[in-house]
């Protein structure tokens, strides 16, 4: 059986033409980097490793200065929690940088129209609260007071403000950046929106195992993480997710404080105002990002 001799036709074939030029004033549609699922594993591992190293370092210094290793001061706990949040944000940025230079818009830090922002945020808020009401009616979920008190919320005004800032501002920003901005982005490009949202929700619930007073909270947190993924998809912006996360944490934080009334409104206004200021600063120094995101 004979075959035709090989030719160099392929080698002589000219390369495909460049993409056609766009009209003046028209920007090309940016493409979100296709982060890999292995990056999620690496980001988790790196975040946990940095958190552990920071805990050993800061905790060791505190113990060397006379603190009780079994009951660290609230200020140390605040610092350790901050280190953990920053560790996971840094891990996401580092792993993402191995694929492409990280830009804020790639993680969803971009504006969106006010209509979808408010509309879908309200839908997500009511959907999660309906689920929470049904879940609470079926399962006896214990009250949660441990975390704010561990952060020193009951030891004075300054400690209360620090704990509130950490829970209602830092945590929503860091967790949404890591889970919705990076983890969901990677898993969505791997297995699609629904599988990505489910997996991200499960991971979001699992990461809170050490900070919740009862395992019965984990399904609630997993569903909350899932809802936040869908909110991100509908608005194509991380900011509605951050706002909803902050509102949820603010209400939960206020629920741990006995006798709070008008303080709840102050907490909500303060946390959302701070987040809005941070968003404006990011937009100013990081750029507004593209108008339309390509679907990953």
Predicted regions and their residues:
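Functionally important transmembrane alpha-helices
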Residues: 54-56, 198, 213-271
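Membrane-interface helix/loop boundary segments of multi-pass membrane proteins
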Residues: 174-199, 230-237
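Alpha-helical transmembrane segments in multi-pass membrane proteins
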Residues: 44-99, 267-269
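Low-complexity, intrinsically disordered extramembrane tails and loops of integral membrane proteins
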Residues: 1-38, 291-296
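Small-polar-interrupted transmembrane alpha-helices in polytopic inner-membrane proteins
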Residues: 193-209, 246
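Juxtamembrane helix-loop-helix connectors linking adjacent transmembrane helices
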Residues: 61-78, 101-171, 189, 287-294
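C-terminal membrane module of polytopic membrane proteins
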Residues: 3, 9, 243-296
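Hydrophobic alpha-helical transmembrane segments
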Residues: 41-45, 78-79, 117-122, 161-165, ...
